[in-house]
Curated annotation (Swiss-Prot):
SUPFAM superfamilies: HIT-like (SSF54197). It comes from Homo sapiens. This is Adenosine 5'-monophosphoramidase HINT1. It is found in: Cytoplasm; Nucleus. It is linked to Neuromyotonia and axonal neuropathy, autosomal recessive: An autosomal recessive neurologic disorder characterized by onset in the first or second decade of a peripheral axonal neuropathy predominantly affecting motor more than sensory nerves. The axonal neuropathy is reminiscent of Charcot-Marie-Tooth disease type 2 and distal hereditary motor neuropathy. Individuals with NMAN also have delayed muscle relaxation and action myotonia associated with neuromyotonic discharges on needle EMG resulting from hyperexcitability of the peripheral nerves. Changing H112N: In NMAN; the enzyme has no residual activity although the mutant protein is expressed at normal levels; no effect on homodimerization; loss of SUMO-specific isopeptidase activity. Residues 18-126 form the HIT domain. CDD domains: PKCI_related. Changing F33S: Loss of SUMO-specific isopeptidase activity. It is an enzyme of class 3 (hydrolase). The lineage of its organism: Eukaryota, Metazoa, Chordata, Craniata, Vertebrata. Exhibits adenosine 5'-monophosphoramidase activity, hydrolyzing purine nucleotide phosphoramidates with a single phosphate group such as adenosine 5'monophosphoramidate (AMP-NH2) to yield AMP and NH2. Hydrolyzes adenosine 5'monophosphomorpholidate (AMP-morpholidate) and guanosine 5'monophosphomorpholidate (GMP-morpholidate). Hydrolyzes lysyl-AMP (AMP-N-epsilon-(N-alpha-acetyl lysine methyl ester)) generated by lysine tRNA ligase, as well as Met-AMP, His-AMP and Asp-AMP, lysyl-GMP (GMP-N-epsilon-(N-alpha-acetyl lysine methyl ester)) and AMP-N-alanine methyl ester. Homodimer. Interacts with CDK7. Interacts with RUVBL1 and RUVBL2 and is associated with the LEF1/TCF1-CTNNB1 complex and with a KAT5 histone acetyltransferase complex. Identified in a complex with MITF and CTNNB1. Interacts with CDC34 and RBX1, and is part of a SCF (SKP2-CUL1-F-box protein) E3 ubiquitin-protein ligase complex. Interacts with SUMO1, SUMO2 and RGS17. Interacts with the Ten-1 ICD form of TENM1. Interacts with CALM1; interaction increases in the presence of calcium ions. Keywords: Acetylation, Apoptosis, Cytoplasm, Disease variant, Hydrolase, Neuropathy, Nucleotide-binding, Nucleus, Phosphoprotein, Protease, Thiol protease, Transcription, Transcription regulation, Ubl conjugation pathway. Widely expressed.
Length: 126
């Protein structure tokens, strides 16, 4: 977890991201789901027994800069996350998280929904 905090503290918006490369299939990922609007894949550094990301194919660097026109797309990410969670057997529950900015722990400046499950989640999360 400390590694993710360090990454978030130095990450900056702008330019291409690792997620853009995954969308373009320039680097491999364990893809769970894909449609014309988004992609879901397993996190390379899982923080729970099941941990995957759902990302829009449209580049949106942060939730704070999303446009009103992105509302349907952002909602779609949650619906896809719910369906993938069910497909992966997370029937006892799961957590959905979007990190925003460096203090929020955002380490990649391409909006992404974390879905974590497979164990009891704790509160508070931070």
């Amino acid at each position: 977890m400390a590694d993710e905090i360090a990454k978030a503290q130095v990450a900056r918006p702008g330019g291409d991201t690792i997620f853009g490369k995954i969308i373009r299939k320039e680097i491999p990922a364990k893809i769970i789901f894909e449609d014309d609007r988004c992609l879901a894949f397993h996190d390379i550094s899982p923080q729970a027994p099941t941990h995957f990301l759902v990302i829009p194919k449209k580049h949106i660097s942060q939730i704070s800069v999303a446009e009103d026109d992105d509302e349907s797309l952002l909602g779609h990410l949650m619906i896809v996350g719910k369906k993938c969670a069910a497909d992966l057997g997370l029937n006892k529950g799961y957590r959905m998280v979007v990190n925003e900015g460096s203090d929020g722990g955002q380490s990649v400046y391409h909006v992404h929904l974390h879905v974590l499950g497979g164990r009891q989640m704790h509160w508070p999360p931070g």
